[in-house]
Amino acid sequence: MAWSIALLTPPFFGPGRHVQAKEYREPRGCVMKMSSLKAPVLRIQATEYREPRGRVKMMSSLQAPLLTIQSFSGLRAPSALDYLGRPSPGFLVKYKLAKSSGREKASRCVPKAMFERFTEKAIKVIMLSQEEARRLGHNFVGTEQILLGLIGEGTGIAAKVLKSMGINLKDSRVEVEKIIGRGSGFVAVEIPFTPRAKRVLELSLEEARQLGHNYIGSEHLLLGLLREGEGVAARVLENLGADPSNIRTQVIRMVGENNEVTASVGGGSSGNSKMPTLEEYGTNLTKLAEEGKLDPVVGRQPQIERVVQILARRTKNNPCLIGEPGVGKTAIAEGLAQRIASGDVPETIEGKTVITLDMGLLVAGTKYRGEFEERLKKLMEEIRQSDEIILFIDEVHTLIGAGAAEGAIDAANILKPALARGELQCIGATTIDEYRKHIEKDPALERRFQPVKVPEPTVEEAIQILQGLRERYEIHHKLRYTDEALVAAAQLSHQYISDRFLPDKAIDLIDEAGSRVRLRHAQLPEEARELEKQLRQITKEKNEAVRSQDFEMAGSHRDREIELKAEIANVLSRGKEVAKAENEAEEGGPTVTESDIQHIVATWTGIPVEKVSSDESSRLLQMEQTLHTRVIGQDEAVKAISRAIRRARVGLKNPNRPIASFIFSGPTGVGKSELAKALAAYYFGSEEAMIRLDMSEFMERHTVSKLIGSPPGYVGYTEGGQLTEAVRRRPYTLVLFDEIEKAHPDVFNMMLQILEDGRLTDSKGRTVDFKNTLLIMTSNVGSSVIEKGGRRIGFDLDHDEKDSSYNRIKSLVTEELKQYFRPEFLNRLDEMIVFRQLTKLEVKEIADIMLKEVVARLEVKEIELQVTERFKERVVDEGFDPSYGARPLRRAIMRLLEDSMAEKMLSRDIKEGDSVIVDVDAEGSVVVLSGTTGRVGGFAAEEAMEDPIPIL
């Protein structure tokens, strides 16, 4: 009958593992039980099977590599366990030996008493000792191997004490080999313990009992080793110059210190505490306030006074702080704790303690029914007996449903009687939405809490709050904040971060700005970073050389490594001197300025709020010329848009309205949509930065919901609206409503609040901010009027005649717009811009732009294209149509140029690297001439081009 206790190797250490004890009854009443190890590392499953002739055997099945501790019995006569650990002829023989040993039944249960109490570190020591035995080739584990295991474990109390005495693993191994030498090399799978080692394990159990511990750790093993006093381990310690009595003293001292730390950390409670449950599941805010660990609370005087008034009531003395997230509800409770700590409160609450309850900790670990209720009742009983406790529950709506299982009641219902009778003074805090969703649904709970509204502070109040918090953030980030930075944080967060609330968003701004400035000053110099990169490469090459046993190369790499480390140290020292000089020059080190706050806001929102640089100033002043490179003519529209952008960029626009809102009216193909694209590409980064809504998709009444999102219960409710979601993601953008007259009239009703207030509420009730968007609507209304009056507008008229004609047409188009759109819609627009019809001269300039696009596409294929003046005139003649604008021109270029080029490229007459000239012959036919052949399509170059004037 063989027994073994199997231990997993270190990779299997981890929480939540255990050994399940299996009891097995032998014949004739001999009862034994497998060791139920409590160490969090093992999972041994015992399986039982019956051998022939009635013998019963139990094997431990383990799904991992294992080490075994076998036949533990101590120094007395051999016991049943000693023989059970070895192969044996039969059960009756073993039982007789057990009877003849004369030991009590308790002595046979030593393994159970021992190993179920081993800590993770102690098990690791035993495993390491067996590994040391294998390394030395010994087929036993003695005291010397246990000593080596204690040193090798590295993290326990025993290892720390031995290290402090100057005892290391390398020297100890040398001493052990000097004394006992190396073994034969053949080591059995199961390595037994020597009698002295068994004695050490027994003594470690006694030491643990004397210290009042119900576990055996590495420190107890070391104490047992010292108490045994003889054996190889004692000689090793003596040779290394260690004093056993001194080691014992140090171990006991460290054990005592650890116990003190554990008592102070474990929930803050101690054996003498009158409120162990409260201290375990709560945090004493008053104590933190006395220690100065809470942030100062600025303002909020009316709210704190109202809370004190409610707390002084006889019944229902439970205030509930209600406000938006981030307005400072928790800060009011902390402010009350600070006032109590300083004595600045009425006598009704003087000397009381504010404790914040951690609901998550209270619920955590309550596996069985009744555990949560028991904890909560203990908590309430402690508060009732003390009569000096004010309980603060943040996110008080979590009470509803907390701990409720099938057939159980939740925390809110348990607390209701105490809240109503005044036995429990409780401050709750929750958001407006959660209060409506959870607490208002339960009128019985709602009447027990007295609501205290916590409004969002104004910008001026937020600035005062930031000034009060400045010192804490300066100490944390080791820098200074200027007054301008604090003012900018409050103002810019209020203006540009619309989905959050003051003062939280302003505090986050100064916090992140401080982090940015500190990291910027802490960066390594560029030279040091390069050297660090070289050092990593050299170290890698050195290690590879060592692995390949190229020691000469490894030596040269080592020398270079030393040189690089010295260079890095020199660079860092120089950098510190420079930084010190800069800090002295700046009078106090790094400083967070207004520009740092502006940069963080721009990073968060994508809105450029930094001060306008000189480069950007010149760019804004030259905006008209830049836009005219893409949009030909239409000076009025280009000037109006440029004025709006300049106004917004310097901060002179109305902060409660969009940057600008225009309606572009004119005939088709004159550049209405092209101007919006050009503006998006020039100022907002790219054409993709524009939100384009084709209003022909919103012709039916029900499609209006696509803009703001479907109502609840309809398909697409969770996806949000096309307009609102796009603006929420990119608040600084251009929104183009193309062909606005095609939309259903209800769309215009929805746009009224966008144009006036710069805001829109989506289907989920969230407010979307349009204050940083540029709204452009295009329309073809009035195009018939422009077409009729266009005959009197042309390049053959003088300047005054053209202006008067344009003004007359603009007034006519405006009248048509008034007939089509409602007055309240048109009245909210900043400007109604009428686009002129294109003249032939303007069409010629547009032809240049379109031909350049074709040239650019051919350059990708390494083909150089030139066109003559005659060809360009031919394109303009065919593509000019005042009624249709520039779109016929695109069709003419496609037909005359692109089709001819495509045919020649497919026939391989034009290949990569060719230079191509496109001209028109005397008969008006298009001729494509290649620079490599000189003749393409049957015409010589000199015949076709009498006077070629390439423009591109």
From Swiss-Prot:
Task: Check the record and name the SMART domains matching this protein.
Answer: AAA, ClpB_D2-small
Residues forming the UVR domain are: 532-567
Q: How does activity depend on pH?
A: Optimum pH is 7.5.
State where the protein is found.
Plastid, Chloroplast stroma; Plastid, Chloroplast membrane
- Which GO BP terms sit in this record? chloroplast organization; protein import into chloroplast stroma
Q: Which residues form a coiled coil?
A: none
State which tissues express it.
Expressed at low levels in roots and inflorescences. Expressed at very low levels in rosette leaves. Expressed in photosynthetic green tissues with high levels in young, developing leaf tissues.
One protein family per Pfam? AAA
Assembly and interaction partners? Homodimer and homohexamer. Hexamerization upon addition of ATP. Interacts with CLPT1. Interacts with CLPS1. Stably associated with the import machinery. Interacts with CLPF.
Biological role: Molecular chaperone. May act as a suppressor of FtsH-mediated thylakoid membrane biogenesis and may enhance photoinhibition. Seems not involved in chloroplastic protein import. Probable component of the TIC-associated stromal import motor involved in inner membrane translocation. Has an ATPase activity, but no ADPase activity. Interacts with transit peptides with a positional preference. Localization of the signal sequence at the N-terminal end of a protein seems mandatory for interaction to take place.
Q: What is this protein called?
A: Chaperone protein ClpC2, chloroplastic
